[in-house]
C-alpha cells in the first residue's frame, strides 16, 4: 500500500521520487477500540489507535497538507510530501482530516491520493466509487478519535473553501468529527427576506397561507406535516419542505422554527418564543452542513449552532445560556386525511415550492442513506419510519410506525411507560397521561437510533 501511495504522490507532483525523513515519533500507547461484534462483522477489525500528541514533523505535515493547501489554493510537491508523512505516521486519527479534505476534492488524482493515504492508515482498501463515504463510514463505525487540535485544521479546510462558516466552526458541545459538508452553501439571508434567491437551501420566513378550500393544487395523497398549536392547525406540504427545509412561522400565537431533514425523514416543530430572559427569538437557518446525515441548523442572530434533532444549542451565546427548544408534535399525514380531520386548517401557498417536486424519498434515498452514517442499530431497517418520543422518565422510545398504525386500527392500545399513541388524520401522535401534546415526530430509524443510542423500541424486536 505504501508503494501504491508513493506512486500516486509522484504522479501528483511530477517528481521521479519523493523521499522524506520522519521526525522521531512521540511515545504513544496503542489501543484498539472495543466494538460490537456486529460492527466488526460489517466493517472489519479496526486498527490500533495511538494516544497523545503528534510529533513535531507530523504536526508540520498536517499544517502543510491540510491548512496551507486550502489557504494557498493549490496542491503541490510540499503537500504530497506531507501526505506521505501522514500516511506513514501510523496514526489513524489523522484520517478524519483526510476525510474532510476528500469531501471537497474535485480532482480525481487528489481524491485518489487522499483515499490511498486513508487506506494506508486504516489498513483497508477503498475502491467503492464513493471512497469518501466509505472511509467516513469506517471512521464513524469504529469511533476513531479525532487527532489533537482537530478543530483548527478542520476549520481552515471548511472556512477557506466555503465562505460564511467562520462563526460556525467554533468550540462548543459538538463533536466536530461528525460534521461534514452537505453540498450547499449557508443560508445567511436576513430574516423575512427569504424570497431573495440564494445558492443555499432557502428557508421561508412568515410564509403566506391559504384555506384548505383554496389549496386546489394539492392532491389528497400528497404528504403533509401537520402541526396544531392552541387549537390552530396548519399543513406544511412535503414538496414545499423538501425545497425549503426550514420555516420560521407563527401559529396559535406561538413562534415556531420548523426544520425538515430530508435525509432523516424528520419534520420537527420547535417553539422559538420560549427562551431565557434577554434572549432574542432564534431565527433558524440551514448551515449547509450535516451531522451524521442530519442537517445542522443555526440561529441567524447569534450564529449559535443547534443540534437539529434534539433542539439544544451546542455553540455560541445560546449554548452558554443553555437554550433548549421545546417541541410541538408534527403529524405526518396525507392532505386528504388532514383536511378531512381538520377542515379549518391553513396550508402554505404553492409558490413556496418554487416549482419543484423532488420526492427525495422515492428517488434519491431509495437505496439507503447517501451520506455517511456509520453503523446502524440492526433492530430495524435504516429507512423504517418510527414515531419518536422521550418519556417522562427520560427514556427515549421509538414506535415502529407501521406496527403502531396496524395495532391502533384494530383498536388496541399502544403504550410505553407514560406515553400513549393515538391516530390523528391517518397519522400518529404521542400524548402524555392526560392526553397532552408531548412533542413527538416521525423519523427514519437510523436517525432516531443514532441520536438516541440504546433507545427502547416498540414492539420489542
Feature annotation, model-predicted:
Residues 32-52, 56-81, 92-461:
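Mid-to-C-terminal functional-domain signal that highlights helix-capping/loop sites
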Residues 27-31:
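Boundary at the C-terminal end of the N-terminal hydrophobic targeting segment
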Amino acid at each position: 500500500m505504501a508503494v501504491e501511495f508513493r506512486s500516486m504522490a509522484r504522479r501528483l507532483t511530477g517528481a521521479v521520487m519523493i523521499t522524506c525523513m520522519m521526525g522521531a515519533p512521540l511515545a504513544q500507547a496503542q489501543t484498539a477500540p472495543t466494538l460490537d461484534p456486529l460492527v466488526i462483522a460489517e466493517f472489519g477489525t479496526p486498527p490500533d489507535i495511538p494516544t497523545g500528541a503528534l510529533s513535531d514533523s507530523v504536526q508540520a505535515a498536517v499544517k502543510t497538507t491540510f491548512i496551507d493547501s486550502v489557504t494557498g489554493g493549490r496542491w503541490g510537491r510540499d503537500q504530497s510530501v506531507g501526505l506521505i508523512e501522514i500516511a506513514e505516521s501510523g496514526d489513524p486519527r489523522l484520517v478524519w482530516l483526510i476525510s474532510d479534505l476528500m469531501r471537497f476534492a474535485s480532482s480525481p488524482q487528489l481524491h485518489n491520493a487522499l483515499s490511498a493515504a486513508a487506506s494506508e492508515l486504516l489498513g483497508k482498501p477503498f475502491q467503492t466509487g464513493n471512497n469518501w463515504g466509505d472511509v467516513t463510514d469506517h471512521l464513524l463505525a469504529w469511533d476513531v478519535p479525532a487527532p489533537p487540535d482537530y478543530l483548527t485544521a478542520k476549520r481552515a479546510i471548511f472556512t477557506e473553501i466555503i465562505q460564511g462558516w467562520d462563526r460556525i466552526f467554533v468550540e462548543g458541545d459538538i463533536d466536530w468529527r461528525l460534521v461534514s459538508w452537505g453540498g450547499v452553501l449557508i443560508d445567511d439571508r436576513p430574516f423575512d427576506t427569504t424570497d431573495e434567491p440564494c445558492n443555499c437551501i432557502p428557508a421561508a420566513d412568515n410564509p403566506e397561507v391559504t384555506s384548505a378550500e383554496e389549496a386546489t393544487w394539492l392532491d389528497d395523497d400528497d404528504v403533509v406535516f401537520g402541526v396544531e398549536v392552541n387549537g390552530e392547525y396548519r399543513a406544511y406540504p412535503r414538496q414545499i419542505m423538501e425545497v425549503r427545509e426550514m420555516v420560521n412561522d407563527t401559529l396559535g400565537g406561538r413562534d415556531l422554527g420548523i426544520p425538515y431533514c430530508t435525509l432523516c425523514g424528520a419534520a420537527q416543530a420547535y417553539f422559538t418564543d420560549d427562551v431565557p430572559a434577554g434572549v432574542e427569538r432564534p431565527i433558524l437557518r440551514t448551515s449547509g452542513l450535516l451531522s451524521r446525515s442530519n442537517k445542522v441548523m443555526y440561529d441567524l442572530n447569534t450564529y449559535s449552532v443547534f443540534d437539529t434533532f434534539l433542539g439544544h444549542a451546542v455553540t455560541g451565546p445560546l449554548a452558554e445560556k443553555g437554550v433548549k427548544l421545546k417541541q410541538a408534535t408534527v403529524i405526518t399525514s396525507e392532505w386528504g386525511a388532514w383536511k378531512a380531520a381538520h377542515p379549518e386548517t391553513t396550508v402554505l401557498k404553492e409558490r413556496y415550492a418554487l416549482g419543484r417536486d423532488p420526492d427525495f424519498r422515492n428517488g434519491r434515498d431509495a437505496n439507503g442513506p447517501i451520506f455517511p452514517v456509520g453503523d446502524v442499530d440492526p433492530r430495524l431497517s435504516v429507512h423504517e419510519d418510527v414515531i419518536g418520543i422521550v418519556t417522562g422518565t427520560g427514556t427515549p422510545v421509538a414506535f415502529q410506525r407501521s406496527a403502531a398504525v396496524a395495532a391502533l386500527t384494530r383498536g388496541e392500545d399502544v403504550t410505553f411507560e407514560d406515553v400513549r399513541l393515538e391516530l390523528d388524520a391517518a397519522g400518529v401522535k404521542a400524548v402524555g397521561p392526560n392526553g397532552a401534546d408531548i412533542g413527538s415526530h416521525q423519523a427514519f430509524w437510523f436517525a432516531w437510533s443514532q441520536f438516541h443510542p440504546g433507545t427502547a423500541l416498540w414492539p420489542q424486536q
